[in-house]
Amino acid sequence: MMSLNWGSPSTVMGVVLQLKMNSNRLKVLAAGSNGEFPPFLPKQVEKIKDPFARSLAKRIQRLPVQMDFPDKCIMSSCIKPVIQSKNSPLVLLHCFDSSCLEWRCSYPLLEEAGLEAWAVDILGWGFSDLVENRPPCDVASKRYHLYQFWKSYIKRPMILVGPSLGASVAIDFSVNYPEAVEKLVLINPNAYAEGTRHLAKLPKTIAYAGVSLLKSIPLRLYANAMAFNGISFFTILDWTNVGRLHCMLPWWEDSTVSFMSSGGYNVISQIKQVKHRTLIICGENDQIVSYKLVVQGNLNGRPGPGYSQLPPPAAPGEEAVLARAR
């Protein structure tokens, strides 16, 4: 069965760079942009309290990406880096049914470390404009959209970072467009899931009912509770509202049903075709994707003691782990 994991605030990458953080430094990192929220974001963004989410949300922009429409582009949402580096850029994907806001705690640290990092919303999720121009949101379309984004704006081999289902996106992309990828970083990869399986055969009425359930607060609260321990209810509730913000866009249900009905990602046969150097980070305490599944076959995992599906966010006085694939 396909494992579903919603985005969470502190995805990290491997080869450790430790950064001592005090409360003042955290406030600086969270301050970010002092501007307004982009007008295309759902109005519910105003109610979010997480300073990292608010800061990163103000930086979301839409860039035109040419698809198969001869004279039309998809305005595609992303976080564009302010840093231009000679090193390979990091391109950060997200989990199933999530957005670039998943990287809200890690992204400031990456920038502070001098890395050129793009946080890109996968087609059919995030905050792109799919009201008028919505292609099928199947695997092939998601792959082609990412390639067109890379071709238009990144233009050189990248370090592609994918957590959970994002790892399947990264594997599929690297096999089909090897010239666009230098290395892979996979975090708790959901690489052995066999797509959406029986969900792909559901009648449309039932499929839409199920998708409506996906954005419900109780279900997402439960998913966040599985991923984190020792976090207050009100913090979990705020993170839940961050994670479901993109679900408020009018095209979300159609695009998610399109993905589920297509069969989803099944990259098991592609794993052995991956030729790029790959770093895998996984949590020994993950309750969603088994560590034993991560390290089987052709995948070699680096366990993160105490990690659940994703590590908890950095807090004042603690060490933040920042992954650099070099």
Question: What does each of the following model-derived ranges do?
Answer:
Residues V274-K275, I280-C282, D286:
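Short beta-strand/loop motif that positions the catalytic acidic residue
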Residues N87, C95-C105, A117:
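Serine-hydrolase catalytic-loop signature spanning alpha/beta hydrolases and amidase-signature enzymes
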Residues V267, H276, S290-N298:
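Short alpha-helix in the alpha/beta-hydrolase fold that links the catalytic acid
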Residues I171-L214:
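Flexible "cap/lid" loop of the alpha/beta hydrolase fold
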